[in-house]
Amino acid sequence: MQYWQLNVSEGNAAFASNQFARAALHYRAGLDELLSIERFIHCDSPPPKAWIIDQYLPALIVSYLNLCDSKLAQNKIESACELLEIGYQTALNFATSFVQKSDFQLQNSALRHLSQLKKYAFLLAKQLANKPSSLLKLNTIINTHTIINHNIH
């Protein structure tokens, strides 16, 4: 098991035990590890694009979602919304840099993965209708139109 996967597993165990702060620490460590892997993806001999889009991007997205969940469980709503906004922008920038020169199947896969963050933002926005500052962050995600959308359509 890779270091980031171990942290996700330990974070999940902590979350299941209602130890949300501890879960957040594990999720953050796993996310940081994934973000450090990105430099290998941008090197002279990167892994295959299919692995990047079908393995790395979903892991990155799930890591942000796990961290957001742990922040919400601690009632740190602003922090969760900020993380979701950062996560969406990070995943979007990352995906866009790879899929512009990819085939339709990889573009579609990347868009499907990114839609998970948008879906999460929609669900969270419904719950936070009375928190305008949080809604602003979520609306940034909800209203983003990506280059990937334009390439596919």
Task: Describe each model-derived feature in a short phrase.
Residues 3, 53-56, 60, 80, ...:
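Residues that mark the junctions of alpha-helical repeat units in TPR/alpha-solenoid scaffolds
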Residues 7, 57, 64, 111-114, ...:
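TPR repeat positional signature
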Residues 20-21, 77, 84:
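TPR-repeat structural position
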Residues 27-55, 89-99:
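Short, charge-rich amphipathic alpha-helical segments embedded
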